[in-house]
Every structure is written in structure tokens, then in C-alpha cells.
Design a protein with these regions (language model features):
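Alpha-helical ds-nucleic-acid-binding substructure associated with the helix-hairpin-helix region
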Residues: 20, 53-127
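Intrinsically disordered, low-complexity, charged terminal extensions of DNA damage-control enzymes
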Residues: 1-31
Length: 127
């Protein structure tokens, strides 16, 4: 279902939603192309306030300012480096595991070619 079809459906089944839909602009979503970065960002943001997660993610990105945020460069950093920017040991472990899964081919580079169910089944195998 695309956005337009979803908005039409919501408008037809919920009068309050119809008012909101008519009042505000249609949402715009930016499609992510760097799936590795999206997964890492999700890990960092889990169970944190938006403000805290944003600060930690900003520090994380500064480690890769030259555009080198990829599985290999993530693995090259030490646990201590990640701890120093505010990541918990558990999140560091998850991030390393995702990076390792990318480098060993467990996670395909072209996630956009896979269905939701295939992606979910792949990701739940990683701890």
C-alpha cells in the first residue's frame, strides 16, 4: 500500500483521522539506501530518550566523518572507543554482531530486493 492509498483508507474509516489528514501535509519518507547504517542507528536509539540517543548517535557518526561508516570500519574500532561515546556493552555487542553478519555475507547488501518476511528472518538470527 502506498501513502496515498493509506491516507484515503484512513480518511474513509475514521472521521478524526480524516480531519487530521486534511489539515496537515502528506508525510514524506526518505528511503534509506545504507541499510547497515539504518540497523546500527536503530540499535543505538533502542530504549533511550530521543535526546540521549541523538547525542550518542552524533558521537558515533563523528568516528566515521570521512564517510567510512561501513561494517569493516565499525569492526576496526575498539570496545573502549564505543564505550567512551556512551554506548552500553550490550549495544556494542549487537553492533559488532551486525557488522560481522554483513562482512560474512549473512546479511545481503541489497536488502531492497527482499520481502519483509525474509529481512525479519535474517535479522532475528543475529544477536
Amino acid at each position: 500500500m502506498n501513502i496515498d492509498a493509506g491516507l484515503i483508507h484512513l480518511s474513509s474509516v475514521d472521521h478524526k483521522m480524516e480531519k487530521l489528514i486534511n489539515k496537515f501535509e502528506k508525510p514524506y519518507f526518505v528511503k534509506e539506501n545504507n541499510y547497515f547504517e539504518s540497523i546500527v542507528r536503530s540499535i543505538i536509539y533502542q530504549q533511550l530518550s530521543t535526546k540521549s540517543a541523538s547525542k550518542i548517535y552524533g558521537r558515533f557518526n563523528k568516528l566515521f566523518e570521512n564517510g567510512s561508516l561501513n561494517p569493516e570500519s565499525v569492526i576496526e574500532q575498539s570496545n573502549d572507543t564505543y564505550r567512551s561515546i556512551g554506548l552500553s556493552r550490550q549495544k556494542i555487542s549487537y553492533i559488532f554482531n551486525v557488522a560481522d553478519a554483513y562482512t560474512n555475507g549473512m546479511i545481503p547488501q541489497n536488502f531492497d530486493k527482499y520481502g519483509d518476511e525474509d529481512i525479519i528472518n535474517t535479522l532475528i538470527q543475529i544477536k
